[in-house]
Amino acid sequence: MHTRVLHVLEFDKVKEQLLEHVSSSLGKEKVEKLFPSSHFAEVTNWQEETDEAVAALRLRGHVPLGGIFDIRASLKRAKIGGTLSPHELLDIASTISASRQLKQFIESLHEEKEEFPHLAGYAEKLAALPEVQQAIERCIDDHGEVMDHASERLRSIRQQLRTTEARVREKLENIIRSQSAQKMLSDAIITIRNDRYVIPVKQEYRGVYGGIVHDQSASGATLFIEPQAVVELNNQLQEARVKEKREIERILTELTSIVAEHAEALLENVDILAQLDFIFAKAKYANKLKATKPVMNDRGYIRLLQARHPLIDQDVVVPNDIELGKDYTTIVITGPNTGGKTVTLKTIGLLTLMAQAGLFIPALDGSELAVFRSVYADIGDEQSIEQSLSTFSSHMVNIVDILRNVDHESLVLFDELGAGTDPQEGAALAIAILDEVHGRGARTVATTHYPELKAYGYNRDGVINASVEFDTETLRPTYKLLIGIPGRSNAFEISKRLGLDERIIERAKSHISAESNKVENMIASLEQSKKRAEEEEKKAKEARMEAEKLRSDWEQKWEELHEKRDEIIEEAKRKAADIVRASQQEAERIIRELRRMQKEKQAEIKEHELIEAKKRLEEAIPTLEKKKKERKKQTQHAFQPGDEVKVTSLNQKGYLVEKVSDDEWQVQLGILKMKINERDLEYIGSAPKTETKPLATVKGKDYHVGLELDLRGERYEDAIVRLEKYIDDALLAGYPRVSIIHGKGTGALRKGVQEFLKKHRSVKNFHFGEANEGGTGVTIVELK
């Protein structure tokens, strides 16, 4: 794959867009080195990695990629015995923390129904190293300062520093507050020069305080003097600072040695974090482009469905269907310039490069692309000024280079093949070049405005004509690719609409041969027929999709019904078995009691004892028949509006509102009203005497309960009180799922909300919202 081709097809601009989605300098480095692969297995592997990352983002909405630093240089210095600075150590601790969070995030994905083998493989290799992180964070604060409790000696030294410093300031405060200070000092302040405390003394009073002059003002009128009274204390202060510096150096050396012990594991972590950042950047870019995973093949087959050029505004770009490599291996796109032919050419080439780099492509799901050994492109005016070559010559240099290497594993893109020279010779050359490339088995797309190449598409096996549609009403290209129809100039139609005299147009037509006119008319007719066929196909496709959707919905409902039925039958069997088992046990106990009484050889078993035993035996007989009769009796109940019922399929209680048909009732379930078949209803109780009260009672509680609760700006305690009440109200309202808006901010409120939800007995599950629901600023709660 030549770098010149990547530049011509603007792959570098795709990389620039991809860079916007990386989270670290490590990921940026990966993107900058991104290069399409020519190996099928490698491309397939890259695509699967991107697919897993897209699925993870879809399920979780975000991925923890913050706090990753490029610590490779620091690790190398630690390995050779250098001492790391506090900020370098903090970056290492942060990167370890990021590794752990990302590892936990990926491992938690096993809770989902989907598989993530590639991501799980990376996560498994990430070393947690909590002892290294803890050692660093125990000694260094967030600002990169070594803390007092990093060691007992450092604590003691700093205590001495504070005490001595306080004594120095106290002595100097006494000096500057004295009555004589007003005339002797330039200003009543204490300042520092050369790390020693001094006071600003006027030049004429320099001998009053004794001590050492450390500095003077620009004018020389003020001297910064360390009074003799604090010289000794300042000396003690300096000694303490030296001790502090040595102790800090010792602590940093100790921490560096801990890092050095785990340098290899940390370097491997860095490589994995870089790869994961890069993979998730590809996934985020795919989401931005609304791109899909292409099906990759090694047969040279391309099938793009509604493909869009990724660098054109997605609101205005015209999607196209493109197929190559099955019935035909060469497409010749004819028609006038500025008709969108080059955009189509670049779309095919750029999407191929993106797919071979592991990126999703902006096309519909089901699109297919081949892995080519090489992609060649001769596009645009790239004449060499240094070589003083003409446009034709510069193109020919590229074409000669292409012909030197092209084979059946190549994709070749020619823009305006044969242009820049005599039209007749140019067309002949174009045909000969296409024949050569086609004969070698390469997949080829060529654009040209030579009419001679229209016939070429009809006369060669495996070659097809194409054109970009032109709207003669608006005098603009629609940029829609028409496979199977050659292009035409539309010069006469455009001239007529722009006001050129009809006589001139007719005279111009007379200069064109009858054969050419016949071909142009045939092309126009083909365009109209194809347009009508596409419209009919679109309608048929929409109807088929609607039918398939309905079928899918009904199949799902049928499956759910069968699952529910099987569950009910299993539950009934289990209960029946329990009843039979209990009855048998009771019967056996009674029989054992009778036998015991007989064994005791009582003179006579009293009649009332036999009657009592027989009665208990009869009571122990399973009551299934009785239950069946009760069930039958219930189903035969004449339902009335207001009756309390149970909807068996939903396992929910409600009230009958009105009968809507012979076998269907409207049922009030919480705040919902649903139409339920009478067979699905189980009678519980009759309507109360008071009119409509049951409905009012059900409706009253949840009348104003919304599907979301906004806690932004609330104090933590108030927010939790509101949240607890809201969850209770939502449960009474029968909501299966609600949203809690807590915002992003510092994360304190979010953490508090989620801690509360973890402990709530009625919360089934919760997770952050999707990107379009508010992301990490919203928690979605599923209720039991």
Swiss-Prot record:
GO terms for biological process: mismatch repair; negative regulation of DNA recombination; rescue of stalled ribosome. The keyword Transmembrane helix does not apply. Keywords: ATP-binding, DNA-binding, Endonuclease, Hydrolase, Nuclease, Nucleotide-binding, RNA-binding, rRNA-binding. Residues 709-784 form the Smr domain. It holds the Pfam family MutS_V. Its EC number is 3.1.-.-, 3.6.4.-. GO terms for molecular function: ATP binding; ATP hydrolysis activity; ATP-dependent DNA damage sensor activity; endonuclease activity; mismatched DNA binding; ribosomal large subunit binding; rRNA binding. It comes from the Bacteria. It is an enzyme of class 3 (hydrolase). ATP binds at G335, P336, N337, T338, G339, G340, K341, T342. SMART domains: MUTSac, MUTSd, SMR. Homodimer. Binds to stalled ribosomes, contacting rRNA. Belongs to the DNA mismatch repair MutS family. MutS2 subfamily. PANTHER family: OS10G0509000 PROTEIN (PTHR48466:SF2), OS10G0509000 PROTEIN-RELATED (PTHR48466). This is Endonuclease MutS2. The gene is mutS2.
